[in-house]
């Protein structure tokens, strides 16, 4: 019988039960016991769901209260000194302080840095290490969760982040080489593997996703050393797991490592199958990632079955396992909950539960079970209906794309001339202050939106409520003394969803939530067809907000690359083509904002770096169309209109030329967690336009001291001309409360005023 396995399951629950439990605990409404009870219930539910879907070997230790990389650091006692006292007194509180920061009871701790998990929309906490780092087992989470499943009658495969990837995903605070710590880390892994074996685990999934990256000789040697060491002690069988791309030139290395099985991504790396089969050692299990763990489209089962049958004929009997390409963490839980979705589009989709069923169908087909044919036929019919659907293809969009020229992507004049025209129009002080866009989405705002959507609040009453919130936001900013204002975005549920709801070619689920980080969940739009803007999307609210103040009001848009990256994107055409379609829709919106008197327009591109292919050799093509798309959206304005953009979590050294090529008049970037380290790229490159380095971390409720912000601004001023500098938070303020927001922004304005006075 063909084995069906899974690499990971969504943690949050089909109805975001984990999010609610976490936030209740953080508010002090529930204690740790109640939180852990919810966590146990979710794990049990998910294991049973996988078993019932036909998964023979589901994972354990894929669950996390916040983040699996943080879990790994915590498990191995890689806890920075500043958290030791709290962790020793209350481990769970210390764990959450590492994730979120903590400012209470005379404790003032900032959080670990957060960044994107490879090129996905999930975020992980970056472990902080140093040259004298000590590792030791703290707790027994992987063993406890394996035994928890066993008590339910379900045998699982514990998941561990592998030692080399753990180090490569970490940062050292003293400039030392992360891989030099491998010697100290391996004994702890060896100890853990021995304990898992003693607990009865037959297999352990050891994730080494960095195997799909460009690796230098030192890193390749670290892999050899690590797995030679792990192979010496007693251990369960190891499934060496790669995902997010082909192994490429690391294939030989991966097959040399002494593991008992190898998982490969055959969605993003279909071309690697032959090379793997030609060199797979006898007796080694091949886990074939045939179902896309990152997107929500039904699998072309006939194509997947062809690959599976080909592999089946080349590996030892019972040594072919079927799996998703990666963990299902990145997709919603269950399509069956979507009762009101367009029936045609719904028939083209598969969420986590459905993807597991697809794997069971493939396994049954391989085993020649007749019941598989019905499901295969249904899939063929659904895919053909999608290919032929007029909902997907629009001739007017194709005509507009064909009419694009180089002039479509150019501003009228160069930045030096534009900046003079803008300063003449805007008359801003030195170190101008602004925010990134959103203001706190309070419970009242969320409840009003929910009541409006459910029909309990009339459109006129909802509009009156939003106008009052917008005016309060504008008045608050004026009182604080900000220079360029925003309207607060109270009418928006999400920075992508809000636009997607107003664009043809997008569709939305009701419960299609995926985890972004911690309790933060997003409901990505689904781009199923050609994109068109039927009507203006933001002009009414931006113009209303501008009518309330004499200060400049920013129009706020989400950029084409970010809308693409943060959506589930159609897989029947190149991503670049879909991105250009979105850019043309935004181009029309930018033009309408300018006509309405909006003189500052921000086109957020926080996701531009995460779209980079994992292999450097593929970067140029992506950056070309990403920059082109931004410029399509932003270039049809007068010199006096100031174009801003914003980027998150980015390391800029290797893409700084592309960032400059966007030709935004002002770029704001997230720098506070990295203590302004990210500015180095702009300094070395001599970035010509204006920059707003974030001076405080909005992902934490902590209110920083004025002196901290002044110090960060002085660090920025030491390396960049003062006339280039703007002052702003790291990111939008949607998830923060009003009290801390007002206090932090007032402190930020005071910091800017101090620099102006010097």
Swiss-Prot record:
Source organism, top-level taxon: Bacteria
The record's free-text note on cofactor binding: Binds 1 zinc ion per subunit.
Reactions performed catalytically: 5-methyltetrahydropteroyltri-L-glutamate + L-homocysteine = tetrahydropteroyltri-L-glutamate + L-methionine
Binding site for L-homocysteine: 436-438, 489, 604
Residues annotated to bind Zn(2+): 646, 648, 670, 731
CC cofactor: Zn(2+)
SUPFAM superfamilies found in the cross-reference section: UROD/MetE-like (SSF51726)
Pathway: Amino-acid biosynthesis; L-methionine biosynthesis via de novo pathway; L-methionine from L-homocysteine (MetE route): step 1/1
Active site per UniProt: 699 (proton donor)
Top class in the EC scheme: transferase
UniProt GO BP: methionine biosynthetic process; methylation
The entry's keywords: Amino-acid biosynthesis, Metal-binding, Methionine biosynthesis, Methyltransferase, Repeat, Transferase, Zinc
EC numbers, comma separated: 2.1.1.14
Binding site for L-methionine: 436-438, 489, 604
Family: Belongs to the vitamin-B12 independent methionine synthase family.
Protein name, UniProt field: 5-methyltetrahydropteroyltriglutamate--homocysteine methyltransferase
Protein's organism: Xylella fastidiosa (strain M12)
Lineage: Bacteria, Pseudomonadati, Pseudomonadota, Gammaproteobacteria, Lysobacterales
């Amino acid at each position: 019988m063909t084995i069906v396995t899974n690499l990971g399951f969504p943690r949050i629950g089909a109805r975001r039960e984990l999010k609610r439990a976490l936030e209740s605990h953080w508010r002090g409404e529930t204690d740790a016991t109640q939180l852990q009870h919810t966590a146990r219930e979710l794990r049990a539910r998910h294991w049973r769901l996988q078993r019932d879907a036909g998964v023979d070997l589901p994972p354990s230790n894929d669950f996390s209260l916040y983040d699996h990389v943080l879990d790994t650091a915590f498990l191995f006692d890689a806890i920075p000194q500043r958290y030791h006292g709290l962790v020793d007194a209350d481990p769970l509180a210390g764990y959450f302080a590492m994730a979120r920061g903590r400012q209470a009871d005379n404790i003032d701790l900032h959080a670990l840095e957060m960044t994107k998990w490879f090129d996905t929309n999930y975020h992980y906490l970056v472990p902080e290490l140093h040259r004298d780092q000590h590792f030791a087992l703290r707790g027994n989470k992987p063993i406890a969760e394996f035994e928890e499943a066993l008590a339910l009658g379900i045998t699982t495969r514990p998941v561990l982040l592998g030692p080399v990837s753990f180090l490569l995903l970490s940062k050292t605070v003293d400039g030392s080489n992360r891989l030099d710590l491998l010697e100290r880390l391996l004994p702890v892994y060896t100890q853990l593997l021995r304990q898992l074996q003693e607990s009865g685990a037959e297999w352990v999934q050891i994730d080494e996703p960095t195997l799909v990256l460009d690796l230098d000789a030192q890193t390749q040697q670290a892999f050899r050393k690590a797995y030679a060491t792990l192979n010496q002690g007693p251990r369960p069988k190891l499934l060496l797991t790669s995902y997010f791309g082909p192994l490429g030139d690391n294939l030989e290395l991966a097959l040399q490592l002494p593991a008992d099985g190898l998982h490969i991504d055959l969605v993003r790396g279909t071309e690697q199958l032959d090379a793997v089969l030609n060199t797979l050692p006898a007796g080694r299990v091949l886990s074939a990632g045939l179902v896309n763990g990152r997107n929500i489209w039904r699998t072309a089962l006939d194509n997947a079955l062809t690959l599976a049958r080909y592999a089946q004929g080349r590996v030892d009997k019972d040594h072919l396992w079927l799996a998703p390409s990666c963990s299902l963490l990145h997709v919603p839980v269950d399509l069956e909950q979507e009762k009101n979705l367009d029936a045609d589009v719904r028939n083209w989709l598969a969420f986590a539960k459905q993807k597991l069923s697809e794997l069971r169908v493939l396994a049954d087909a391989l085993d020649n079970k007749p019941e598989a044919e019905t499901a295969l036929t249904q899939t063929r019919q659904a895919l053909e209906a999608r290919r032929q659907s007029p909902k997907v293809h629009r001739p007017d969009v194709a005509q507009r794309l064909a009419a694009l020229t180089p002039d479509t992507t150019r501003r009228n004049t160069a930045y030096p001339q534009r900046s003079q025209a803008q300063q003449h129009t805007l008359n801003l002080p030195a170190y101008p202050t602004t925010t990134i866009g959103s203001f706190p989405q309070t419970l009242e705002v969320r409840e009003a939106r929910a009541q409006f959507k459910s029909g309990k609040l009339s459109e006129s009453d909802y509009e009156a409520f939003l106008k009052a919130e917008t005016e309060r936001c504008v008045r608050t900013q004026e009182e604080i003394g900000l220079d360029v204002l925003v309207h607060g975005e109270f009418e928006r549920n999400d920075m992508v969803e809000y636009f997607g709801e107003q664009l043809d070619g997008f569709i939305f689920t009701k419960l299609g939530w995926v985890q972004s980080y911690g309790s933060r969940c997003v409901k990505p739009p689904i781009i199923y067809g050609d994109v068109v803007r039927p009507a203006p999307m933001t002009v009414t609210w931006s113009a209303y907000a501008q009518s309330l103040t004499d200060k400049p009001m920013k129009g706020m848009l989400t950029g084409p690359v970010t809308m693409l990256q943060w959506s589930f994107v159609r897989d029947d055409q190149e991503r670049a083509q879909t991105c250009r379609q979105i850019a043309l829709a935004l181009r029309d919106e930018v033009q309408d904002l300018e006509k309405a008197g909006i003189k500052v327009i921000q086109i957020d591109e926080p996701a531009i770096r995460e779209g980079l292919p994992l292999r450097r050799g593929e970067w140029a093509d992506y950056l070309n169309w990403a920059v082109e798309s931004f410029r399509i959206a932003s270039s049809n304005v007068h010199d006096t209109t100031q174009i801003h953009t914003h980027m998150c979590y980015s390391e800029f050294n290797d893409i700084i030329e592309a960032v400059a090529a966007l030709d935004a008049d002002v770029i704001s970037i997230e720098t506070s967690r990295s203590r302004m380290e990210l500015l180095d790229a702009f300094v070395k490159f001599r970035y010509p336009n204006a920059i707003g380095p974030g001076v405080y971390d909005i992902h934490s409720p902590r209110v920083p001291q004025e002196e901290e912000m002044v110090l960060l601004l002085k660090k920025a001023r030491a390396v960049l001309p003062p006339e280039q500098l703007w002052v702003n938070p790291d990111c939008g303020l949607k998830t923060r409360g009003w009290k801390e927001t007002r206090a932090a922004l007032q402190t930020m304005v005071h910091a800017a005023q101090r620099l102006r006075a010097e």
